[in-house]
Amino acid sequence: MANPVGAIRQRCAAIGEQLQGVDWLRVAVDFPLYVAERFRRDACLQNAATLSYTTLLALVPLLTIGLSIFAAFPVFSGLTEQMLDLLFENLVPASTAVVQQHLEDFVGRAAGLTVVGLLALMVSALLMMAAIDRAMNDIWRVQQRRRPLHGFMVYWTVLTLAPILMGASLGISSYVISVTRFGELEALSGLQGLLLAGMPFVAETVAFTFLYAAVPNFRVPLRHALLGGLLAAALFEAAKGGFGWYVANIPTYEAIYGALAALPIFLIWLYLSWVVVLVGAEFTQALASYSVARHRAAGTGRDAFRLAVRVLGHLWRAQREGRGLSTRALSRLEPAAGEMGVLQVLRPLRRARAIQLNGEGEWMLARDPSHYTLLDLYRSEAFPLPSVAALRKDGDDWDQRLADSLAQADTGLASGLAESLDDIFTSRPQIRPVVRQANSPSEER
């Protein structure tokens, strides 16, 4: 399947080469495409769908636990109904009022459960938090998960802090309204509308920032989490307004589902909300990884031939086991190149029909390595040859074997690169001294 984001990035990179003096413009074009490519590669749309169904099952337990925590603070007594109104007014479109009524009824019934029933609800809520944890750690490429006790404390902190922040937001709103209503501070009359209008955005920004900073098992810089929170809050408000307008003005679901339209509408809204959350997470992670990825990709061009051989070797090894490798898996096998570096090698290899994607989106060899030579690889995309001395110094078996062939190429490029990739991958390295000759092509490189 063709990758439209990758194709766009290639075109933008070509344009960027002509804008050598305008680095900020190249970054402004390439960074959003970098985020979009990571979003696609991390299967965020599929993860958003999974999280939507998980949220639908855990929503009543979450509200029950949140209201219980909220009621435990005397300062918030009597504000339960106002908190629910605040929650639904600012987090869901106006067209899902029917869902609000049903959820309030469900929460009221859940409040009468026994201790065992409440524990079961808590498990449902924690399972949803665990699903969020997996999605976030996949975005940050975190392999090691938290210890169970540490993870439970993080989840419980999120469940506890959310009602408190909402209660504080509601308390500030009530204070501003009461002050202006009784005319104690006329100067606040203009400030009232500003505070009330901006408070949902501020609360959403704080919530998203906390989510991006606390949930990944990774030290996320606070400024990156804050920028991601601002972006997610802005996208969330835009999505809420746009989706609310669509449902109100284009009543497709009401015409099809009738009285049951609220359920698919609410489910779609949950899906859009999680898409926004994951976009913000990818943006937050990209703020830290983009500069490193650019640096690695810049160095990859000088080492592209070696990396191409190594990528083909990893695919050859995986194919002997009857499987392919994803881009992410190849990036983990070649961490020095990074994702952008590996992608810069995969694209020309695919154009040369040396590799292809299988039905599962994994890379596999498309040529028989016993008949595909180093010369074929060199001529396919004119990869620059690496230094033999550098390969000898720090290389592994594959690098040493490649160095043998390049050393032979000093006396004849065609004969030296006539060796097949299968020979490179199966033969043990034969250590030979580096032959230094005048005007040696590989040494000059």
UniProtKB/Swiss-Prot annotation:
Keywords: Cell inner membrane, Cell membrane, Membrane, Transmembrane, Transmembrane helix. Its main location: membrane. The keyword Transmembrane helix applies. The chain crosses the membrane at residues 56-76, 112-132, 152-172, 195-215, 225-245, 259-279. Disulfide bonds: none annotated. It is a multi-pass membrane protein. Belongs to the UPF0761 family. PANTHER family: INNER MEMBRANE PROTEIN YHJD (PTHR30213), UPF0761 MEMBRANE PROTEIN YIHY (PTHR30213:SF0). This is UPF0761 membrane protein Mlg_0521. It comes from Alkalilimnicola ehrlichii (strain ATCC BAA-1101 / DSM 17681 / MLHE-1).
